[in-house]
From Swiss-Prot:
Localisation per UniProt entry: Secreted; Host cell; Membrane
Entry protein name: Deubiquitinase and deneddylase Dub2
Residue spans crossing the bilayer: 36-56
Membrane topology: Single-pass membrane protein
Organism of derivation: Chlamydia trachomatis serovar B (strain Jali20/OT)
């Protein structure tokens, strides 16, 4: 009997697959395509992360240039030379607007300084102006207690009450950014603009309520930045009707109630663009308009402002230079007194 030889048990051996790295030049066509796609994908992701690191305001303020033909580029440079002659004009913000209104109050006495602690926008200016004029009316007839009187933080209630009693011209400034479509969004945009230190798309416009002349005047240095003149007139006519009820006509017949409560007149003060492109001078133009109004409420803006851009710029530059030093006395933002 022959011995049985059992075969040795088979064992499974697992070997680690070897990875061979090949250069792009020696790689197969499919590998090359795969590597190119991966590289492009990583580049796109990297660019997206870089763009996310920028704020929206940084993108708006970035400089972009387009290649124009020689003739178009020459015409553009000629237009810019007409406008941007001389050093850049300073930017007047809410503090400058307040200081200038204090200067006008000191000169004309009938002007109430601008309250910059309550930001006005196109969403709340109608209600705010009505409340301010109603407060003046109640103060005049001693219906408002000193404790109930709201006054700016840099003015005492007693002084604010006296200023209200002696004022008949009420200037209000509105801040606007076209990208904001609600009051909350507008205030958020305002905070972002102040924090960034950039003007961006922000803009100041002016509303003047004159009780003696029973008139509401609107001024926009860009003419139609917030809305068209007709749209602004429609909004202001509602305000004018409310003011007519708050301040009835003096000397009218008691029997003619409609005549007594006739609305204030509405005037659109800007029929042309007076602010040049590339300049941030809306605040200074609001102050210049207010100064002209206080000299003559019936003045014609087109007669005051030159049509030539360089002459118009020189006019505003002269106004700023002759006014800034006098305004500096109110740099502490304290309200003027009636003493």
């Amino acid at each position: 009997m022959e011995p049985i030889h059992n075969p040795p048990p088979q064992t499974c051996s697992y070997s680690r697959p070897s990875t061979t790295y090949t250069s792009f030049k020696d790689a197969s066509c499919g590998t090359k395509v795969t590597r190119i796609i991966i590289a492009l994908f990583l580049i796109v992701i990297s660019c997206g992360l870089i763009l996310c690191a920028y704020t929206f305001r940084d993108l708006l303020d970035a400089d972009y240039s387009a290649q124009e033909g020689p003739q178009q580029a020459t015409k553009l440079l000629q237009q810019l030379d007409k406008v941007l002659t001389g050093p850049p004009l300073p930017i007047w913000d809410n503090e400058h607007l307040f200081q200038f209104s204090c200067l006008m109050q000191n000169k004309h006495r009938r002007v109430l300084p601008i309250d910059i602690c309550n930001p006005l926008t196109k969403f709340n200016f109608l209600e705010y102006i009505c409340n301010c004029l109603m407060t003046k009316q109640s103060v005049n007839v001693n219906e408002t207690d000193m404790c109930e009187l709201f006054c700016p933080p840099t003015c005492t209630p007693e002084n604010y009450r006296r200023l209200l009693c002696t004022s008949s011209v009420f200037p209000f400034v509105m801040w606007h950014d076209p990208s904001a479509d609600t009051q909350e969004a507008m205030l958020t945009k305002m905070d972002q603009t102040m924090s960034s230190g950039r003007v961006g798309n922000s803009h100041w416009v002016l509303v003047i309520v004159d009780i003696e002349h029973r008139c509401v005047t609107f001024f926009d240095s860009f003419y139609n930045y917030i809305a068209s003149p007709q749209q602004m007139r429609e909004q202001l006519e509602g305000l004018a009707a409310s003011l007519g009820a708050i301040y009835p006509k003096e000397g009218g017949s008691d029997s003619d109630q409609e005549e007594l409560l006739s609305p204030f007149q509405v005037r659109i003060g800007s029929t042309v663009k007076v602010q040049s492109p590339g300049e941030f001078t809306c605040g200074a133009w609001c102050c210049q308009f207010l100064a002209w109004y206080l000299e003559n409420p019936d003045f014609d803006l087109e007669e005051k402002v030159p049509t030539n851009p360089s002459e118009r710029r020189a006019l505003l530059a002269d106004f700023i230079s002759t006014t800034e030093q006098a305004m500096s006395r109110y740099s502490s933002l304290s309200w003027p007194t009636t003493d």
